[in-house]
Amino acid sequence: MLLIGEYNSKLTDKKRVAIPKKFREIIGNKMIVTNGFEGCLIIVSEKQFEDITNDITVGKFVNNDIRDTTRFLLGGACEVDLDSQGRFVLPSNLLDYAGINEEMCFVGLKRWIELWSKDRWDEKKKQISSNASEIASRLETVKD
């Protein structure tokens, strides 16, 4: 099954986040949350995180871009276990990085979830919408 869709949520007073049920059913109760690109967070299963980081670290250790990307993704990462209601506590360093104060949005992107502050997501969505056909035409040359 694919992680798809957009779900709005709110941070609780105790800084807990509830993962949407449809996402929990796919990703499970143990996951990794880390810094994402463009000011959001990335939520993935432990297995998916291992696959992503293996793809990055297969390069040469002497390459600064590889080391910096590894620092960015692994240095900010935390393992989380969901409680019986599908919630976990989001550490303050990740809340600060993503600018999440209260309202947030989960966005399913096939193999991972992005977690955005509602304001940042609304702005990003406008930006994408206004350039969607241009972006899609550039992707014609990109291969998996």
Summary of predicted features, one role per range:
Residues 1-9, 13-14, 22-80, 84, ...:
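Flexible "stalk/tail and boundary" regions
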